[in-house]
Amino acid sequence: MTDSGDLCPHLDSIGEVTKEELIQKSKGTCQSCGVGGPNLWACLQCDCPYVGCGESYSDHSTIHAQAKKHNLTVNLTTFRVWCYVCEREVFLEPKPVTPVSSAHRCKPHDQDPVSQTTCYPLKAVPIAVADEEGSESEEDELKPRGLTGMKNIGNSCYMNAALQALSNCPPLTQFFQDCSGLVRTDKKPALCKSYQKLISELWHKKRPSYVVPTTLFHGIKLVNPMFRGYAQQDTQEFLRCLMDQLHEELKEPLFDCSGGISEVEPDLSLDSCNLVDGDRSPSEDEFLSCDSGSGSERGDGERAGGEAELLIQDECVAVRGTGGISEKERLKERRGEERTREMDEDADVDTAAQDGQAERETETATPATAVPAPGNTEPDNEASMHCPSSRPCSPAHSVQELHSRLSSNPPRSSPLRTGPTYTFKKAQMLLSTKKKKQSRFRSVISDIFDGSILSLVQCLTCDRVSTTVETFQDLSLPIPGKEDLAKLHSSIHQSAPVKAGVCTDGYAAQGWISYIMDSIRRFVVSCIPSWFWGPMVTLEDCLAAFFAADELKGDNMYSCERCKKLRNGVKYCKVLRLPEILCIHLKRFRHEVMYSFKINSHVSFPLEGLDLKPFLAKESPSQITTYDLLSVICHHGTAGSGHYIAYCQNVINGQWYEFDDQYVTEVHETVVQNAEAYVLFYRKSSEESVRERQRVVALANLKEPSLLQFYISREWLNKFNTFTEPGPITNHTFLCQHGGIPPTKYHYVDDLVVILPQNVWEYLYNRFGGGPAVNHLYVCAICQVEIETLAKRRKLEIDTFIKLNKEFQAEEAPTVILCISMQWFREWENFVKGKDNEPPGPIDNSKIAVMKGGHIQLKQGADYGQISEETWQYLLSIYGGGPEIAVRQTISPPDTDTHGERKIEAETRAL
């Protein structure tokens, strides 16, 4: 409860006012300028009926208060009370809030945090680093934060709902709050900085009523032109684009156990359990491969006065911000403030991998996509019709090589494709020795959201099994119909796999008449409530449909390498590694040739205890398989128009809230369970991880004197605080491969490390392994020399190129002009300008060359540049490669025709 000393002394000036009166006033306008709501302010002075606008307009409420000496005012949207004299929010009636069956407007000041925590305990409340400054009382910390709305800035509800759902994912939010020193990038538009600022505003202790995410909105438009303008977009496509860009800006090279930078491994085997993570960098191709590993994710703690101290507490106090916005609070601020790879010797991959390997290795930026259901490759929403994108690879870690894995991109279907058409060919990607060395990368995004699926295709003639591992960031699940449910339930009872193309037969090839009739039937059915025409569909049914076996026959026959011809086959998949946060996307949108429609079937989903063990591969290293719901995004409307909202569970008090743009409303959990889910976020749950953190807290509180103090990665410690499976300690977030501090990180190393007492370090090291142990921080001299050498090399190469190119431009008629691939040249340019730390591989002109008549010629429409012969020879001497392609060559002068001269001379002699 609020201490008596904290009560505002001006509360006596309030007259009698009821909630009904305030609601009635909220429907009015400002009495000075006539502007309407939201966020009008009503004067609470006795017998004063004044209603004025807030700071978002002319702030007539403040002008009225200063002129009339009226101290208290209430926001008619959030019902929060502000005192102008005390310059702070005040609380009228602190009392517990009991669960209600209907939604009511959220009033954080009316909630007793103690009773809330008691009545609604979280299943897994992680421990987080405490606020060292102690600026907030324990009671204030337990009051819910994060209940801040977002203003709709032009059909932006799809963005607002997605951001609110992400904001209520504690591992991600706490990273941006507590590991702000790691949010550094020189990549435009620096979306991670915009997102970090937004998170700090949403979770600020001053609890603003709403914010305007303008900066992030502009940034996402720069990343993907699809979001420009003010048309309604798909929230799932926005999520993929945002998270992919955050990964690109925050990714770091992954170090292997020996301390070196981990690179692409050409020979990997599933049997050895040496599964390697994929780099999440995106690609334009369908089934491309890349590698990445996992690393540590977050750390926390502070260094203060040289004392070794580990401050940890419940997660409910972990989410805090550094900047404030909103209306009356500003008065107070004026005073202060994956590689797809063969897993057996005969493993196959999609032929798209051959053409796309170079693009994957240069990490072209494209939004990520979800793993498609084996039996359903139809586009699932509007955005997928316009912006087909590929799946990036990503990492994960564990003590027994838990974090190693193969990864690849799943096939992305054509909009008019009615079934999976897989064309497999022998993998060739790793056979070329001329490729640039590729480091593997990880980021907080890949650590939290990336999982992997083991896909197997079996030839039914020779029984050969081809195995691949696909990295996913979200699972796009089909919604089975009545017939599909019958097949699924039948297969469950019979303990046999479904081989009938679950959820796809209804969309298979058919005649025009039957196609039109079936389309009309499905359109009519989609307009009827699901309870009228179909059985209850559960999320487990959707998962079963996704993982059901799919026959490859007819037009979708499997090209078997052993048989050397098309054969009937069967494809099925299992989860190889579960992500910390599982994002599930229900495919509610269908796009036919002539129209689009939405599947309005209600899909029931559990708030707690979603178990994925039935869908886990036997090779999976994942130990924890149960999930609890964090947030759910809902779409109301049709395929052509509608509105997005989000339901999220507040991590502080365990209550559920509806986020509808700038309005935040507390709701009962039954409202959430009855929602028409579109995107769901589930988090791994484990009581053991909570007890693990409690043991560390107890060790830290012992304050045993120790002769040695250990530095640990702030990122990994934060990961320990928020993950159920944090993996081995990884101190290479602040160490180089030589064991020192990279010169580029030394000036902000305090933001990257936390000092632990010896007993805490020993417990964590014995429990999780990893390392290395660090007792002293020093700048790495080897890295310093390498940086200086690299700088000299860059300067020499760019100066020489500029000199040779000037000479080339000065030539009026150069005898020889050679071509160079602009793709390779851009890589080289990024290297010499310092944008890329790794030099490019050998010159690769293969994509701009074509063989004609036994001679290499320039391919028509190729992306190339023209350079002089001297420039070509200079670059060739450094990087090698080829082939040489000339657009103008030296023409030898023709032999002089002396026959005519001799004839004239002979005739002259004859005369």
UniProtKB/Swiss-Prot annotation:
Deubiquitinating enzyme involved in beta-2 adrenergic receptor (adrb2) recycling. Acts as a regulator of G-protein coupled receptor (GPCR) signaling by mediating the deubiquitination beta-2 adrenergic receptor (adrb2). Plays a central role in adrb2 recycling and resensitization after prolonged agonist stimulation by constitutively binding adrb2, mediating deubiquitination of adrb2 and inhibiting lysosomal trafficking of adrb2. Mediates deubiquitination of both 'Lys-48'- and 'Lys-63'-linked polyubiquitin chains. One of its GO terms (molecular function) is cysteine-type deubiquitinase activity. Its main location: cytoplasm. The active site is at C157, H643. A zinc finger (UBP-type) spans 6-108. Belongs to the peptidase C19 family. USP20/USP33 subfamily. Residues 364-374, 405-417 have a biased composition (Low complexity). The keyword Ubl conjugation does not apply. InterPro entries: DUSP-like_sf (IPR035927), Papain-like_cys_pep_sf (IPR038765), Pept_C19_DUSP (IPR006615), Peptidase_C19_UCH (IPR001394), Ub_carboxyl-term_hydrolase (IPR050185), USP_CS (IPR018200), USP_dom (IPR028889), Znf_RING/FYVE/PHD (IPR013083). Residues 687-780, 789-891 form the DUSP domain. It comes from Danio rerio (Zebrafish). It catalyses: Thiol-dependent hydrolysis of ester, thioester, amide, peptide and isopeptide bonds formed by the C-terminal Gly of ubiquitin (a 76-residue protein attached to proteins as an intracellular targeting signal). PANTHER family: UBIQUITIN CARBOXYL-TERMINAL HYDROLASE, UBIQUITIN CARBOXYL-TERMINAL HYDROLASE 20. This is Ubiquitin carboxyl-terminal hydrolase 20. Pfam families: DUSP (PF06337), UCH (PF00443), zf-UBP (PF02148). Residues 279-309, 327-420 are annotated as: Disordered. Zn(2+) 3 binds at C43, C48, H64, H70. The UBP-type zinc finger binds 3 zinc ions. However, it does not bind ubiquitin, probably because the conserved Arg in position 55 is replaced by a Glu residue. Zn(2+) 2 binds at C30, C33, C53, H60.
